[in-house]
């Protein structure tokens, strides 16, 4: 899996430039020639759209303008990648809704698997034209990590515009030292990351480390390297990393548990009491209505929700899971015994609010 940010593809005068993309394409070709399968997650559609209608970003609502620019630039982005390869390049646009919904998640995995079987090169981007919440900091970094797990990738390579992770921002701190090997993403390591590193893209080093943590939970190592350096990219094509290696977690979690842990969450939560919290965290139990204190938001049956301990600072999030009942239903059955569900609601989807197979403790 290779993630390429828009700062490596955007031309100084607007639009897209093959300057750094060519070297990255050669890295891809070297891996393909070695018999490896590869998927690209590429930003750059908005930057390409700005060259087509430069004034679009100055007119109308900011989100709507970015969505329009993404629609304008997506074809140019795919054309940029296609020019480097003889094999067909397949455009795949995803949103967090696709990754949140289990059925669509599995369909996306099946489609990507078939594209790879057919010898195509999938190029994935966020479907910014229909996304709203997703147009946020570092979205494609996190998207790359989730897709890496989705396709069972062996490694996640993130091309950036600096030489990897440093102990501090090397552009402002001359004492910053490079970190070649990161065995574990500790709070101290995360604190070394600053904010957004580019005027073009939306992701900084912090989001790249968050992506590495998500990939690591699936047993996937992450490699950060400078995509602007031809020497670095050529060395990488020969399996020599000049950047930062971030090790995967020692304990790999099951694919479904990974999806439960990292799939985007609906704007909702189930509030539970101390007894339910102890049962979830200590016994691996399902969540029953008797331990439920209430619900936040307006989620539906089958939505991914957070499970929070009530009466704590910020309602501490203990777990995530797929709710068997809507927020409205949960408010009505909260604190009741499971056998009362049908009498209260007039129907029942089972005794559990969240079954343990659909739940992961954080």
Swiss-Prot record:
Its EC number is 2.7.2.11. Substrate binds at residues 43, 128, 140. GO terms for biological process: L-proline biosynthetic process. It comes from the Bacteria. Pathway: Amino-acid biosynthesis; L-proline biosynthesis; L-glutamate 5-semialdehyde from L-glutamate: step 1/2. It is found in: Cytoplasm. GO terms for cellular component: cytosol. Residues 267-348 form the PUA domain. GO terms for molecular function: ATP binding; glutamate 5-kinase activity; RNA binding. Pfam families: AA_kinase, PUA. Its main location: cytoplasm. ATP binds at residues 3, 160-161, 202-208. It catalyses: L-glutamate + ATP = L-glutamyl 5-phosphate + ADP. HAMAP family: ProB. Belongs to the glutamate 5-kinase family. NCBIfam families: proB (TIGR01027). Catalyzes the transfer of a phosphate group to glutamate to form L-glutamate 5-phosphate. This is Glutamate 5-kinase.
């Amino acid at each position: 899996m290779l993630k390429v940010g828009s700062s490596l593809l955007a031309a100084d005068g607007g639009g897209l430039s093959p300057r750094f993309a060519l070297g990255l394409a050669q890295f891809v070709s070297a891996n393909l020639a070695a018999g490896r399968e590869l998927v690209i997650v590429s930003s750059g559609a908005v930057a390409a759209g700005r060259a087509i209608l430069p004034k679009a970003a100055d007119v109308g609502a900011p989100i709507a303008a970015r969505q329009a620019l993404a629609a304008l630039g997506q074809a140019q982005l795919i054309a940029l990648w296609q020019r480097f390869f003889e094999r067909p390049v397949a455009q795949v646009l995803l949103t967090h809704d696709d990754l949140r919904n289990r059925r669509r998640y599995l369909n996306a995995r099946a489609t990507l698997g078939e594209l790879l079987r057919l010898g195509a090169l999938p190029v994935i981007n966020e479907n910014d034209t229909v996304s709203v919440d997703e147009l946020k900091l570092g979205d494609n970094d996190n998207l790359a990590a989730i897709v890496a797990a989705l396709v069972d990738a062996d490694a996640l390579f993130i091309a950036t515009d600096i030489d990897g992770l440093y102990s501090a921002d090397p552009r402002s701190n001359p004492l910053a030292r490079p970190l070649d090997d990161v065995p574990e993403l500790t709070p101290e390591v995360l604190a070394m990351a600053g904010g957004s590193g580019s005027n073009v893209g939306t992701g900084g080093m912090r989001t790249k480390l968050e992506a590495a943590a998500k990939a690591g939970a699936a047993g996937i190592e992450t490699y950060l390297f400078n995509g602007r350096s031809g020497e670095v990219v050529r060395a990488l094509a020969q399996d020599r990393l000049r950047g930062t290696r971030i090790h995967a977690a020692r304990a790999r979690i099951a694919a479904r548990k990974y999806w439960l842990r990292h799939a985007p969450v609906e704007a909702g939560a189930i509030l539970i009491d101390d007894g339910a919290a102890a049962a979830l965290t200590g016994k691996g139990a399902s969540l029953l209505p008797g331990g439920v204190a209430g619900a936040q938001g307006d989620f539906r049956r089958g939505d991914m929700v957070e499970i929070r301990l009530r009466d704590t600072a910020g309602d501490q999030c203990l777990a995530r899971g797929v709710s068997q009942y809507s927020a409205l239903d949960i408010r009505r059955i909260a604190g009741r015994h499971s056998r009362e569900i049908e009498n209260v609601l007039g129907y029942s989807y089972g005794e559990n609010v969240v079954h343990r197979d659909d739940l992961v403790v954080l």
